[in-house]
A protein has these predicted regions:
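Conserved active-site tyrosine of GNAT-family acetyltransferases
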Residues: 121-123, 127, 259
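Conserved acetyl-CoA-binding loop-helix of GNAT-fold acetyltransferases
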Residues: 82, 88-101, 227-239
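Amide-forming acyltransferase catalytic core, primarily the GNAT-like/NAT-type
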Residues: 127-218, 228
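Conserved GNAT acetyl-CoA-binding A-motif
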Residues: 103-115, 241-250, 270
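Active-site rim helix/loop that mediates acceptor-substrate recognition in acyltransferases
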Residues: 2-6, 23-67, 176-196
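A short, well-structured alpha-helix characteristic of acyl/acetyltransferase catalytic modules
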Residues: 2-10, 19-29, 144, 149-150, ...
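Conserved beta-strand in the GNAT
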Residues: 55, 61-69, 74-81, 198, ...
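Conserved catalytic-core motifs of GNAT/GCN5-like acyltransferases
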Residues: 111-113, 128-142, 266-278
Length: 296
């Protein structure tokens, strides 16, 4: 296990690879920082085969974490957290540097979603702004604006992959078209619980026009080729999970209009930032909900 000793002012910490004994500390750190995280979600994050996790340890205590998630030609930096009493000592930057070094060994493009003051750290490391992601949540007006099941189809129907497993492969292909990334390693783990939107053409043939994922601990991505498909998927999701928060690019103007029509309110924003080459083929207009803040 490689170790990197980092000194920042009065802060001496060892940054090393994650060990299973660190799990409870990570649940506490990540949960306190982001809220809504569960042991299941953290367990998935640290055990995913394409993820490298680092922790910062001072004495016998884990005081920080960072992750590098690889999707081949692209990679994401996620879950960068430092304990409250260890901040403003350079440890967040050190954790990010280690994760970036791991990611750049495999990827041409390294991406992340930065919140607030963290953007300054990433800018110092060479990351460039690519565009804001707004986070939206339901209001008191939302329930009345969600169409009942079956009331809104517009030539579309939703099919669960549990009933039609072959559709999951089409959803993975659609995700690659939308994101420009090969996220199969993550999506295949959620394949049995996907829902796919099929659109009927003038000739009567159906094609995959969108999908949404459901993770064991909560909701996941919503990707759609058009606003009508997105509306069907979002209404279906909000009927199932009314408290869902939607994080998607501001560049998706159709998504902004749809969220507003559904009575959602934008209450937070993150900046998508990039180190290295732009992701060829990224289509923000097709992303109506990010898979997670850690991987966009």
């Amino acid at each position: 296990m490689s170790e990197h000793t980092t000194t920042r002012g009065a802060s001496d910490a060892t940054i090393r690879a994650y060990d299973a004994a660190d799990f409870d500390a990570l649940v506490g750190l990540i949960g306190a920082a982001f809220g809504g995280e569960t042991p299941d979600s953290v367990r998935f994050a640290v055990s995913a085969p394409n993820t490298t996790t680092f922790v910062a340890q001072r004495d016998d205590r884990v005081v920080g974490v960072s992750m590098a998630i690889s999707f081949g030609a692209s990679a994401w930096i996620g879950n960068v957290v430092v304990a409250a009493d260890s901040r403003r000592r350079g440890l967040g930057q050190a954790l990010t540097e280690v994760a970036v070094a791991a990611a750049r060994g495999r990827a041409d493009s390294v991406l992340l979603l930065a919140l607030g003051d963290a953007r300054r750290i990433y800018s110092r490391l060479g990351f460039e702004d690519e565009g804001l992601y707004g986070t939206w949540q339901a209001t008191d007006a939302t329930a009345a604006r969600i169409e009942p099941a079956g009331a809104l189809d517009e030539g579309r129907r939703i099919v669960a992959t549990s009933a039609a497993p072959d559709l999951a492969e089409h959803a993975v292909a659609l995700d690659r078209w939308a994101t420009g990334e090969d996220r199969r390693a993550y999506l295949e783990l959620f394949a049995p619980s996907m829902k796919v939107a099929l659109a009927r053409g003038d000739d009567g043939a159906e094609t995959v026009a969108g999908y949404r994922t459901r993770k064991p601990w909560g909701t996941g991505a919503v990707v759609a080729r058009d606003a009508a498909t997105a509306r069907v998927l979002l209404c279906d999701l909000l009927r199932e999970a009314p408290g869902t928060r939607f994080e998607f690019p501001d560049a998706n103007e159709r998504g902004v209009r749809l969220a507003t029509e559904l009575g959602l309110e934008r209450f937070k924003e993150n900046m998508r930032m990039r180190l290295g080459r732009p992701v060829a083929g990224f289509t923000p207009q097709a992303v109506f909900k990010a898979l997670s803040p850690a991987v966009g």
